[in-house]
Amino acid sequence: VDHPGVDGITFTGSYRVGMEIYAKVAGGRRPRPVITEMGGKNPTIVARSADLDLAAEGVARAAFGLSGQKCSACSRVYVHADVKEAFAAKLAAQAGKVQIGDPTQQEYWMGPVINRRAYEAYRAHVAELRTQGNILTGGATLDPRGFYVAPTVVADLPENHPLWKQELFLPIVLVTSFTDFDEALAKANDVDFGLTAGCYSEDPGEVAKFLDTIEAGVIYVNRHTSATTGAWPGYQPFGGWKGSSNTNKGAGGAYYLQQYMREQSQTIVRQGRGWEEDEERGELSE
């Protein structure tokens, strides 16, 4: 960051390190562009009108893909009280279908967590969740030959618990209920991050309110073919709001490339015979 030959910085990682980079650049000799992607605590809202099978599949893909070790993982779900039990059962069933094993083999969908530190963090969180919430499925370590853990769905964790706002980077998703859609939006926005978010609803008014109100850089409605919170960087900008990013083009695709380019306004004032001769030879054109 301090090297005079560095014209710009791109960083993907923790909020703490990202903010340290900003501070160093701000205290430097000259301004330089900084592109960051500093994580997320990504919510999904499941409305009363939602297709629950669609929602359960989309949330499972978002929560457990790459063992939850992605900044766009869905880690909290707000479900209308009238359909909470039905949705939670469907999500737990989706988690139970996940094939866990060597991720280099095609038959396995979820591999191990990255290292012992993550493995021990999973164990510690699960131990606390057993006493504070209701583990619907998962909560177990698996093959002792690797850092394999079970995809975990948790209900009834008090909403003032720190895990509602802490990025876990683990295959753990929390589920709670709401009775008013505005209440769900307020809860979804009540974190320091704003990377991705998802919503399942067949009510056009709710969908419009979600799109207008949610504080996240990448949002999806009724998505199930891939994760309901996720990234599609080859096709659209990927970045976040608040503590997730300083730009909505944090990674991927042509939008990302634009941030490595510099603008320059160029003006030529034509005077004298030389310009006319160049035009006649075709060496200068508009």
Specify the residue positions occupied by each region the protein language model found.
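Conserved C-terminal structural/oligomerization subdomain of aldehyde/semialdehyde dehydrogenase
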Residues: H3-V6, I45, Q99-P103, M110-G111, ...
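ALDH superfamily catalytic-core signature
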Residues: P4, G8, R16-P158, F181-D182, ...
